């Protein structure tokens, strides 16, 4: 399952290959199903500041809202499928920019508080920070230890530190410069998505 998101006491879950589901958790009867959309989900959901929900699907992107199940728009990526990231207008679905990640497929990005997009391609030993408005590359981080990006999402700490899992190793990167703040060898293959506690503790299963 992809990473769930919690907003305004509502839990949004995108089930891989099945459907997108939002369920109320606090302030309502726990687990109450608000709505569901049937789409071939390929990524974790993301929620804009206006409540728009974005879900990557096999064959394109879908936009809806946290309160309704109505699809605002759908968009199919141009050309052949590959490792690219697309920035689409949240209201119309019009493409703003695209960036070629150079891998077999792109992983779900993380968005910083300043709009910076953090993402890497699956199967490659490289990670990017992109300008959220233009798609221009801010920095890249490479490693040469045989570990490659897997289907694990990057996580951003409260101080802007970006954490990535690369197989056997977790890296903490400066969100502004991409410099390596620290790294930790897990001793085992990472098997879960990174999570950051309110005290800054990093959690990952291996």
Segments (PLM) and residue ranges:
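Bacterial N-terminal signal peptides
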Residues: 12-20
């Amino acid at each position: 399952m992809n990473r769930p998101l919690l907003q305004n006491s509502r839990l949004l879950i995108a089930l891989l290959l099945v459907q997108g589901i939002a369920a109320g958790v606090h302030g309502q009867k726990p687990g109450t199903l608000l709505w569901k959309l049937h789409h071939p989900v390929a990524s974790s959901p993301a929620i804009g500041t206006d409540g728009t929900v974005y879900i990557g699907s096999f064959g394109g992107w879908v936009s809806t809202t946290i309160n309704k199940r109505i699809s605002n728009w759908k968009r199919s990526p141009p050309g052949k499928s590959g490792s690219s990231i697309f920035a689409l207008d949240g209201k119309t679905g019009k493409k703003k920019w695209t960036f070629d990640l150079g891998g077999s497929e792109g992983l779900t990005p993380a968005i910083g508080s300043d709009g910076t997009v953090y993402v890497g391609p699956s199967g490659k030993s490289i990670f990017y920070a992109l300008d959220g408005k233009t798609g221009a590359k801010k920095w890249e981080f490479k490693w040469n230890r045989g570990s490659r990006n897997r289907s694990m999402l990057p996580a951003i700490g409260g101080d802007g530190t970006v954490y990535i899992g690369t197989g056997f190793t977790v890296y903490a990167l400066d969100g502004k410069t991409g410099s390596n703040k620290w790294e930790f060898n897990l001793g085992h293959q990472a098997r879960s998505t990174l999570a950051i506690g309110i005290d800054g503790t990093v959690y990952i299963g291996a």
